[in-house]
């Protein structure tokens, strides 16, 4: 079916807007869906549409993360068309741990003044499912807003550290040191005695970090990762795509029990 006049619209969802209000960003899983549709010939746009460069939020060292949903507003494109493009590819990425288990995709169609949500397989979503997915991104942004607006007890350590992304602050850090193999929270003060004991016992074994990628490069075409159609973790004729994040704005830190990357460390 011809989709030349149709468009898939994504709305910027910067969960770290409270710290970086002028950054236009989408979550990394959302960017992947955008790339998949673009590569299939679907016209894609991001709202608000202005002169700011598009960035993406990302997380590293995280075992369990409630990812913000990728919500796609479809205009003049049948739901089954985009579902066929995305469904099997997305399920395979999740099976291979290329996406967070909680990452979700929903399609939205406005018909006769009524807004209808459809799941990844193209089936209508229930009212409860619709409410949950439409509120999820707002909730994560509110949790982050509360955490960064908590006054730091020491101005040298201005980054709050949560426990398991719960919104509860249990410590503070001066900053982040990162390399290709590790993520280290630097000059950490643990303010919560329970968290302190759990770190000492190994129950809280590592750190997860959320940030905004301002500059990134695709390993396949060596161009701007946001603008190209290659997707990190997918295989192409000349290899597997890897995104190289060259400039990032640190935003969110959390002590976690089961970090994906065992090299994430807490430096006291």
Regions found by a protein language model. Name each.
Residues 1-71, 87-141:
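Short amphipathic alpha-helical segments that predominantly mediate membrane engagement
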Residues 132-268:
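Signature of dsDNA virion morphogenesis modules
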């Amino acid at each position: 079916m011809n989709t030349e006049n149709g468009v898939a619209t994504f709305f910027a969802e910067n969960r770290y807007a409270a710290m970086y209000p002028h950054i236009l960003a989408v979550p990394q899983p959302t960017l992947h869906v955008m790339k998949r549709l673009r590569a299939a010939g679907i016209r894609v746009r991001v709202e608000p549409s202005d002169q700011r460069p598009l960035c993406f939020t990302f997380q590293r060292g995280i075992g369990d993360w409630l990812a913000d949903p990728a919500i796609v507003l479809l205009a003049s494109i049948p739901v089954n068309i985009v579902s066929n493009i995305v469904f099997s590819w997305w399920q395979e990425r999740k099976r291979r741990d290329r996406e967070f288990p909680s990452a979700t995709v929903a399609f939205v169609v406005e018909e006769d003044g009524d807004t209808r949500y459809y799941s990844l397989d193209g089936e209508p979503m229930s009212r409860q499912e619709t409410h949950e997915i439409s509120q999820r991104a707002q909730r994560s942004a509110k949790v982050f807003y509360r955490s960064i607006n908590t006054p730091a007890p020491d101005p040298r350590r201005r980054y709050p550290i949560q426990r398991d992304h719960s919104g509860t602050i249990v410590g503070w850090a001066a900053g982040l040191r990162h390399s290709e193999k590790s993520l280290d929270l630097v000059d950490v003060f643990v303010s919560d005695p329970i968290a302190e004991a759990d770190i000492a016992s190994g129950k809280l074994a590592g750190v997860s970090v959320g940030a905004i990628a301002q500059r990134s490069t695709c390993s396949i075409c060596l161009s701007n990762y946001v603008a190209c159609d290659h997707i990190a973790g997918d295989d192409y004729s000349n290899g597997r795509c890897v995104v190289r994040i060259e400039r990032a704005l640190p935003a969110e830190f959390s002590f976690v029990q089961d970090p994906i990357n065992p090299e994430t460390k807490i430096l006291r």
